[in-house]
Amino acid sequence: MSKISQLLSNKIQVKIFNRGRQTAVSWVLLVSLGIILALVLPTHAEDTPSPVKLNQQGRNYYSAGKLDQAIETWQQAAAAYTAAGNDRGSRDSYLNTATAQQALGLYDRSCDSLLSAFKITDNSCNQIIEDVQIIEPQLDGIKTLNQKAKSKLLPAIAAINQQPEEQDKVQGLLRFGDYLRASGYPRVANQALELALASSQKLADPQSKTATLLSLGNAQRAIALQKQNQFSTQTIVLDVVANNSGSVTSALESYQPALDYYQQASEVTPRQPDSLKAELNRLSLLLDIQEFWQGAITDFDRHLDSLEINDPEFLQEITTGSKTLKQDLEQRLESEIGNAIAQVEPKVTQLTATRGGIYSRINLAQSLMRRGASDSQTAQILATAVKQARSIKNVTAEAEAMGYLGSLYEQQGQYKSARRLTEGALQLAPTAEYPDIAYRWNAQLGRILAAQGQRVPALFAYETSFNTIRTLRSDLATTPVEPIFREYISLLLQAEPSTSQLAQARDVLESLQVATLDNFFRDPCSEIAEKPVVIDDVDSKAAVIYPILLQDRLEVILTLPGKPLRRYTIPNLTPEKVDNTIRQLRRNALTNPGFAEQIRGARGNPQSATEIAQLKTSQEKSLQQDILPLASEIYSWLIEPAEAELKASEVQTLVFVLDGSLRNIPMALLYDQKEQKYLIQKDYDVALSSGLQLTAPQPLTKHKQPIRVLAAGVTSEFPAYRFPPIPKVEDELNTIKQIFDKSEILLNQEFTKARLEQKLENSDFPVVHLATHGQFGSTADQTFILSGTNQGDPLINVNQFDNLLRAGNLKRSQPIELLVLSACNTAEGDSQAILGLAGVAVRAGARSTLATLWSADDEATANLMGKFYTNLSQNTQVSKARALRKAQLELLMESDSQYRHP
C-alpha cells in the first residue's frame, strides 16, 4: 500500500451526510467576514431584538458554510433594520450580504447589495459597468490614484468615498473593488481599493488595512495577467532579452506590485486570516510566474529561427541572453517559492477546524500539487481538511477537499482511489444542488474513467459537466472551460463515433466558441440562436467544415447538404505543428506588404518595364517557395479528404467554423497543388462562421428596399497609436455613394461617436461600413476603432462600439445584415482576436462581418470594396460570399496584376 493510501485509510472514510440544501462555496475566499461582523454584533440600544437575532443567525450560517441561508437571513435583517429606521444596522447587514454573495461568486448580486447599503439610487449596476467600460482603458499606465485618475472616478465609488471615515466606508470601497476586479476591470477596482486603504490608515485599523492590501494584491495580479496576455510569448521574451539585457527585475516588473501588496498584507497583522491568505496568494502567484516564464522561454528558443534575424552578432546576443535569463529566473523563483512554502506551511498545518482554515489547507495543497511536492505531505493536508470539514459539518468544504484529494491520486495514476474520492465528492455535492462545484468533479471523473478504459461512463460524466457549464453560463463568463470541452470532444471522436456523437462533438465545439466570446467580453451576452440553424435551411448548396485541434490530432467534422455528418482525422498533427505552419504562412504572406506600392511606383519610372519585371520575378519566387507549399499543406488537412464528397454533393459554398490558430489566415488562401488553384478559384464561395448556434444568416438582398449603406471613415494619421494616413478611404466611401445613392457618408470630423449613434438609431441601414483605423486584440480592452473627432478621445472601445450597435438595433425594424471593417488590424497570431472581431457583430445582431485579417494596402482595399459592392448591386440574388469571391478573383486575374494571392 502506498504512503498516500495508508494515510488516507487512517485519516478518512468516504461517507455521506443527510443534509438540507446548501449552496456551493468557492474555495477562494479572499476577504474574511470578521471585520464587518465585529461591527454588527455590538448593536445600538434602540435596536429591536429581531434584527439583532437575525444578524447572529447570519453569522452562524456563514461560519457553517451555509452561505445561501446567511444571505437570506442578512437580507431579512437589513429589511428589519430599515423598518426600524436604523440606517447603520441596515447598511451593515447589506455589507454582510455582499460579502457572502462574493464568497459564492455572485458578484453581480453583491453590486445590488452594495448600492442598497449606501442608498445609491441614481446608478444601476448595468450603468456602472457601462461607465467602467469607458474608464478602464483610460487608466492603463496610471499606477497611482493621482489627479488624472481622480478625475475619472466612478460616480458610485465617489459616492461611497464621501461617507464619514468609518468602517462601513472602508468595507464598502473594499467590496466594491472586489466586485469590479471579479467583473474584469482591475484598474477601476484599484481606484476603489486605494481609497479604502487610505481610509483604513486614517482609522488606524490594522485588520481593514490587511484586507485592503490583500485585495489590492489581487487587483494588481489581474492587471499583470492582462498585460501578459497583450503580447505573444516571443515578443515578451525578446523585449526583456534585447531591450533590458535579460534582467530578472524587468521580467518580474509587471508582477511586482501584486507581490509587494501581498507581502505588506502578510506583515500588518501576521496572525490574522487575511494575512495568511495573502501569503498563500503570493505563493500561487510565484508559481504562476514560474510556469509562465518556463513556457515562454521554451517557446522562444524553439521558434528562434522563425524570427529571421539576419545579424549573427545580434542572434548570438539574444540566444545567450535567453539562456542567462532562464537560469537567473529559475534560481530567483526557486528560492522565493521555497521560502514562501517554508513560511506558510507551518502556519496552515496548525489551523483549527474553521471554514477559513479548511480552505487555507486546500489552497496550500493546490500550490504543493503544482510544485510537485511530497505526495504524502499534500495528501495529509487534504485529508485533514476533509476530517475538519466533516467535524464542523461543512459539506461544501468537505466536497472540495475530497475532490482535490481525488485529483492528487489522478496525478499519480492511482485511478481506483481517485475515482472513489471523486465520486464521494459528487455524492456530497451533487450536480443539482452544487453545480459550480460539481461540473469540475464530473469532468475529473470523466478523465479518470477514460484513463481506465471505460468510455461510455466517461462520456456520461463529461456530458453532465458540459450541460452543467451551460446552465452556469452567466456565472462562468470569466472562467476558462476550454480544457473540459476539448477533453470531451476528444473522447466523443475516439474509435468510430456514432452520428449522434458527431453531432454532440460539433455542438460542444460551437459552445466553446460561445464560451470564448463570453470570456472575451467578460459577460454572457453572446446571443445563442433559440433553435440551432440547419444549414440546408439557409443554403442547400453549402457545406460546413469544423476543424478541431486536439492534443494529438486534428479532427474535421463535415456537414453536407441533406446527408449525415461525417468526420476525418489527421493523426499526429498537434496544435503546435498547426500553430507553427500558420505562423510561418502568415509571416511569409506579409514579408513584403509594400509590393503593390512598389509596382505602382515603378510604373512612373523610365525603366519601369525592367523594374516591374524584376519585382514580379522576385515575388513569384517567394510565392512558389514560401507561400504556396504551406497553403497547400493546410489545404491537404482541411479540404483534400473531403474533395470527392464536396463535388458529388455539388457544393457551392464552404462555411468554415475555425478553431484556434486556423482563424489567423484567410481560407481563400488555401492552395490545391494538383490543380494549381487557390480555394476561391475552385468554384467555391468561402465564408466563416463563429458557429451556427450564434448566427442565423440571411441574404442581404432579402430587403425589398434599395440597399443603403452607412459609410464612415477616417483618412488622417494617428501618431499616438502609430497609425499612418489612409488617403484612399475617401475614394472608397465615394465609390459606395456612387453605387448606392441612398447611402450616407461620415468622413473624418463628421465621423464621431455621437453622429454614428444618431444615424444608427434613426435609420435602417442594412450595411454599416467603417473604413478607419482599429485594432482587435485578445481582450476587449485591446480592441477598438478610431473616430474622426478632433475634440476629446477618438477611441471607441469594443464595449462602446457594441453598445452603439445594440442601441441602434433596439430602434431598428431590421437588423444590420452586413458590418464591414475595412482598415482594422488584428493582433498578430492572436486567434482570439479574430473570434472577438466576429463577436462584435454577433452580439450586436449583425448577421455578417467583412474585415481584414491584417494590415492591407488602402488602394487595394478601396478597389476590392468597389468591386464587392458593384457585384451586390448588379445581381440582387448574389450572396455576400459570392460577391466577395468574385471581387477577389477580378483583382487576382487582372492583366498586369499587382496582387499575388488572396
Predicted segments, located by residue:
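N-terminal secretory signal peptides that target proteins for export/translocation
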Residues: M1-G20
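Short, charge-rich amphipathic alpha-helical segments embedded
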Residues: A77-Y94, A103, Q513-R522
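N-terminal leader/linker segments that initiate helical-solenoid repeat arrays
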Residues: G34-Q76, A83-A84, R88-D92
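Alpha-helical segment of the N-proximal tetratricopeptide repeat
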Residues: V52-Q69, A80, Y179, N244-S247, ...
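Alpha-helical solenoid repeat scaffolds used for protein-protein interaction
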Residues: L115-F118, D122-L139, N146, L154-A158, ...
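Non-membrane alpha-helical segments in proteins
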Residues: V52-S63, R88-A103, E130, P137, ...
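Classical Sec-dependent N-terminal signal peptides that target proteins to the secretory pathway
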Residues: R19-L41
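Catalytic cores of enzymes
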Residues: D537-N572, P606-L623, I627-P902
